[in-house]
């Protein structure tokens, strides 16, 4: 499969139609291509935003996380969480480029990934199209962040090499 990244304008809380954004920026797709879209764009379009001045971030984290660890002596003020099976800080809640809003993860990222894929299949008349919804994550005891697929559809994400030559 080929992976295609597409640059868009800055998506803001005024943008609430994901399919309209796809219409504007995804002008063509071919068989076996994968569209990668950030969870931030999906979340904004789904209205998963909360004004920063309406709630403490820690309270929002508690609402969204499956599990959380709030260490009172944490010099970085970081809250580690497990959200949808992922170890991720702040339950995936982002405020960078949020223009005064906390941006939560999509409510059901797989449902949205399937919706996007169905739309692309119908729009372009294709059969084999993939969609990945991404975010970034931390790795404990490492600096930096790594890309993370929080949802995918349209392809097998892993290939088994058991029984093959190394």
Regions found by a protein language model. Name each.
Residues 1-166:
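N-terminal and secondary-structure boundary signal
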């Amino acid at each position: 499969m080929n992976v295609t990244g597409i640059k868009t304008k800055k998506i803001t809380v005024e943008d609430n139609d994901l399919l309209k954004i796809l219409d504007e920026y995804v002008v063509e797709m071919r068989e076996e291509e994968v569209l990668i879209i950030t969870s931030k764009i999906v979340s904004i379009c789904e209205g998963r935003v909360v004004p920063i001045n309406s709630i403490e971030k820690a309270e929002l984290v508690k609402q969204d996380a499956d599990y959380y660890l709030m260490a009172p002596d944490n010099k970085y003020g970081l809250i580690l969480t497990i959200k949808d099976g992922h170890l991720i800080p702040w339950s995936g809640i982002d405020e960078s480029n949020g223009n005064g809003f906390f941006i939560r993860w999509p409510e059901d990222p797989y449902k949205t990934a399937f919706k996007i894929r169905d739309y692309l299949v119908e729009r372009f008349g294709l059969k084999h199209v993939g969609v990945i919804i991404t975010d970034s994550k931390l790795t404990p005891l490492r600096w930096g962040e790594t890309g993370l697929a929080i949802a995918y559809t349209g392809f097998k994400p892993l290939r088994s090499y058991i029984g093959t030559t190394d």
